[in-house]
Amino acid sequence: MSVETTTRIMNGYFEALFSGADFSAFFTEDVSWTTTETGDHVSGREAVRNLIIKLHTETFNAHPELRRSGIADGYAFVEADFVGTHTGQFADIPPTGAAIRVPYCVTYDVVDDGIRALRGYMPMLLIRQQLEQASAPAS
């Protein structure tokens, strides 16, 4: 695995992700996603794709605001803010319409045929706190 191959795969993935194209084409068949804070884990190209889409377009109408990224031989990361509006069920919290902004990081394991693993360092407790604060009655 070379830095050039990792760069090509990651650039293609981000271009597809941000343009609304089929970003899952850059996943291996057995790709996995792990949410590190909760330990939640999904496997398979379609399942990982659906999780990313649901988080950005169903649970929230959200987008990342990139802070920094890096690529090495077989590995990559992106650090961003997750910015959006709460539009769907999140855990036991119904849609609130609240605006959220939380920092997060995703790391990627990359092999010759695509992205094999994603680990989302997403502060789920902070998201919950922002939603609960927004939906609390004014005093």
State each model region's role.
Residues 1-139:
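C-terminal and inter-domain tail/linker signature
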